[in-house]
């Protein structure tokens, strides 16, 4: 809709015109993106004299559509495959933020379920023993030994008493699938029992598919959540109006996360001074860190922020326009 208003536009094509709103403004593209058949989409672009491609979803960006379609005569708006890892791999993004001293939640990354469970249960055996709960301490120790040897069952094998204690032991955290999960791979946990359930759901049950081959266990931050989107050409940053989207499915911010239930902008939650802080301390350092690693970032850099009492901290980076944030932005 917005691109169709450009005075410089010749013809506008969309990869999917099954949406009636899109079909009203664009003609259908006969080829779709497939990482294993990139040549065919490139050839279609050549045949139709396409000189600008704007990529919306994160999956094609992570698969390298920008690298495949960019030519001397054709620009592609979006980051290259390597730069898109800032969204495609949450563990990569956390390490990038650590390198650049970008404020974010403390987190640990795990590539196997055994290490994740050991991290969650660390020290509980000694704690139970000091409280005189020798049987529970022995049960935890046995489970940890079995986890070490990869012979442990699921947490359903715990005694009823231990399951009850873990389900009531409040330690809020966030468990995230490291890969792309359409905005749904984040589980908010309030107890240690929920930590373990989330780990098994992601890494054992593969609730989010291959996105759960790695996961993050992250401290839970509290505050208002906002979205800051910026246009980047590799060096210059143009920060757009502040947005706020609402992800949880239920009224009053309850229930599991979705890709987005709705959004509005401009959100009156950060003043000009604080927006300057976000640009200087979050956006610029992220782009500079990638440049130091030999990666030039171009396209949209989206920072999902939590406005904590200690200031804005990064929840996630996305490598594309947010949906639904882009709708009120336009």
Describe the residue ranges of each PLM region.
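ATP-binding N-terminal substructure of ATP-dependent carboxylate-amine bond-forming enzymes
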Residues: 1-82, 87, 92, 135, ...
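General beta-strand structural signal in soluble alpha/beta enzymes
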Residues: 14-15, 54-55, 76-79, 97, ...
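Short, well-ordered alpha-helical microsegments
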Residues: 61-63, 116, 225-226
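Glycine-/Pro-rich loop/turn segments that contact NAD(P) or position catalytic residues
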Residues: 70-74, 81-126, 161-172, 186-189
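Acidic/polar active-site rim loop that often engages polyanionic ligands
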Residues: 74-77, 96-103, 177-185, 256-270
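Conserved ATP-binding module of the ATP-grasp superfamily
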Residues: 103-105, 127-175, 189-227, 284-294
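Short, intrinsically disordered, charge-balanced linker/junction segments flanking boundaries
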Residues: 105, 328-330
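Internal nucleotide-binding/catalytic subdomain
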Residues: 185-328
């Amino acid at each position: 809709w917005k691109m169709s208003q450009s005075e410089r536009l010749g013809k506008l094509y969309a990869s999917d015109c099954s949406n009636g709103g899109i079909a009203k403004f664009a003609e259908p593209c006969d080829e779709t993106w497939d990482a294993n058949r990139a040549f065919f989409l490139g050839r279609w672009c050549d045949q139709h004299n396409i000189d600008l491609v704007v990529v919306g979803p994160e999956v094609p960006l992570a698969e390298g559509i920008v690298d495949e379609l960019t030519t001397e005569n054709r620009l592609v708006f979006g980051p290259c495959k390597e730069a898109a890892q800032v969204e495609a791999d949450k563990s990569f993004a956390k390490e990038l933020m650590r390198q650049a001293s970008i404020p974010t939640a403390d987190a640990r990354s795990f590539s196997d379920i055994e290490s994740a469970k050991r991290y969650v249960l660390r020290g509980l055996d000694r704690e139970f023993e000091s409280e005189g709960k020798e049987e529970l301490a022995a049960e935890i120790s046995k489970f940890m030994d079995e986890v070490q040897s990869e012979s442990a069952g699921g947490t359903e094998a715990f005694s009823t008493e231990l399951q009850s204690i873990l389900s009531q032991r409040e330690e809020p955290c966030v468990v995230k699938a490291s890969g792309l999960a359409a905005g749904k791979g984040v589980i908010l946990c309030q107890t240690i029992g929920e930590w373990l359930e989330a780990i098994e759901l992601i890494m054992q049950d593969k609730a989010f598919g291959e996105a759960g081959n790695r996961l993050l266990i992250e401290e839970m931050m509290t505050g208002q959540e906002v979205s800051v989107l910026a246009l980047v050409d590799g060096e210059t940053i143009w920060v757009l109006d502040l947005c706020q989207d609402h992800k949880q499915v239920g009224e009053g911010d309850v229930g599991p996360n979705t890709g987005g239930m709705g959004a509005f902008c401009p959100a009156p939650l950060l003043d000009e001074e604080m927006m300057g802080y976000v640009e200087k301390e979050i956006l610029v350092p992220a782009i500079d860190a990638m440049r130091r690693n030999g990666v030039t970032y171009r396209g949209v850099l989206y920072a999902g922020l939590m406005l904590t009492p200690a200031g804005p901290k990064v929840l996630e980076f996305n490598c594309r326009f947010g949906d639904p944030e882009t709708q009120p932005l336009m």
